Amino acid sequence: MAAVAMTPNPVQTLQEEAVCAICLDYFTDPVSIGCGHNFCRVCVTQLWGGEDEEDRDELDREEEEEDGEEEEVEAVGAGAGWDTPMRDEDYEGDMEEEVEEEEEGVFWTSGMSRSSWDNMDYVWEEEDEEEDLDYYLGDMEEEDLRGEDEEDEEEVLEEVEEEDLDPVTPLPPPPAPRRCFTCPQCRKSFPRRSFRPNLQLANMVQVIRQMHPTPGRGSRVTDQGICPKHQEALKLFCEVDEEAICVVCRESRSHKQHSVVPLEEVVQEYKAKLQGHVEPLRKHLEAVQKMKAKEERRVTELKSQMKSELAAVASEFGRLTRFLAEEQAGLERRLREMHEAQLGRAGAAASRLAEQAAQLSRLLAEAQERSQQGGLRLLQDIKETFNRCEEVQLQPPEVWSPDPCQPHSHDFLTDAIVRKMSRMFCQAARVDLTLDPDTAHPALMLSPDRRGVRLAERRQEVADHPKRFSADCCVLGAQGFRSGRHYWEVEVGGRRGWAVGAARESTHHKEKVGPGGSSVGSGDASSSRHHHRRRRLHLPQQPLLQREVWCVGTNGKRYQAQSSTEQTLLSPSEKPRRFGVYLDYEAGRLGFYNAETLAHVHTFSAAFLGERVFPFFRVLSKGTRIKLCP
């Protein structure tokens, strides 16, 4: 199909061949020049006539320079006494000889300029056949004539010297340099301007004009473009200025000394260079498109992740807002009840004090009145009065003092809110765990309810299992997780040496894992001492990349977090005795918290790779115990 598409249109090609390369229109009175190319008679005449004008300007400048030199010579001759004028008869004799030489074929004279000969249009007739033959054979006869002209010139000069003794007589001007006429298409040069009519081409153009009145706009000439200065086809390319030019621009002074090649050759060369860049550019484009598609997918994923995270944040804060509102309402209700009870007690105490004050006021008035009396009236029932006064006792009111553990205290509120928030956030994800005995190291002993583990007094005889840890004292939880959020709490106790966390299902159970280096193997003294020394130096036995475990633990002195990609020393403000472990499978996060204060301890960014993740526990020394909290 490509070959068919590249086949030229015969009609279009025929139209192109009938177009003049100068005027870009159908031939009008076509003529052929010596190289075989055809042009309109008017076009080629005007083109070569324009070249004559440039040559004529140059000749005029040369004549002016020669006239100036002659005037200087005459001035010198006059100063030397050589002022004898040239005789008219001698000059006329010279002119006659020059006319005779012109008739013999000399192309330059003193009376007629060369341009007048050049401007004459030559039409090949029968009598010019012999002269044309000489031209195509190399113009040999013309060279012979030039030799004869030189001999005649020498004879004329000798006669002038004999007849005229004036040494400053001006000599005839030297012959002007022969100019060449150039074909606008192939750039072939000719010594003179000559062309012949092409009648067959004129007839063909008439037929083509009847078929198509105007030249095709899709022709090569139209594709080449038009020179904006000379209105001619741009068929050449200047390699110096790197621009397309026409045949007239080629002869101008701005491009005459430049390297010029046909435009079609440059087009083909540049096409080849462009084709060489096509394949690398195509590969680069494919690579960029792949990267662009990858980045677009990444942007889409990031946007989706951002939306989901924003929704999760909004949901969590919504829960938090509702929780705080509920807690606020409950605390306010309890505070009102407490204050109402306190107000009741205070009111009752005030009533009792008012009644006591009234009794004291009456007794005081009676005592004052009796003290004013005398005689028998004073002594009447005096003992009863004394008894009543002595029986009076001051009863201070009950003073209410706020209890720091009551709900209205700041510390109580903070503690209550923190604890309830922790329960709120962990309640939905909290799981009830048990330990898997098939994974427990033989040196470990599990509690009957499978919620606690410690080091046994001696190595136990247990059946070998593919999942059992044999190189380190570790055990996994019985429940594994492949998605979702999960929370569990672990209580640790004892002197030192424990680790809690999570592990992928593909963990190497036969290799040593966890922070602090290797663990107790068989439990003998040498192994224990060797293990203790390694723990102290924090030298892991196996490469971290083989562990697939994320855990937080201690060797009794330092807390550290260790995974397949990091080993970080921790400095918690308090030594946690109860750890909360929070697993977010989709987010790839495993967080550790102080379950008592909810203080953050450490968070891992993990890659679970679609595997199940199990709770992980490790015991390093006797007296250390780990217990799962319900």
Swiss-Prot record:
Please report the PTM annotation for this entry: Auto-ubiquitinated.
The keyword Transferase is assigned to this record = yes
A single GO CC term, please? fibrillar center
Give the pathway: Protein modification; protein ubiquitination
Q: What are the UniProt keywords, alphabetically?
A: Coiled coil, Cytoplasm, Isopeptide bond, Metal-binding, Nucleus, Phosphoprotein, Transferase, Ubl conjugation, Ubl conjugation pathway, Zinc, Zinc-finger
Subunit relationships = Interacts with PRKCA. Interacts with NOD2. Interacts with TRIM17; this interaction prevents TRIM41 activity on ZSCAN2.
**Family, per entry:** Belongs to the TRIM/RBCC family.
Name recorded for this polypeptide = E3 ubiquitin-protein ligase TRIM41
Gene name of this polypeptide: TRIM41
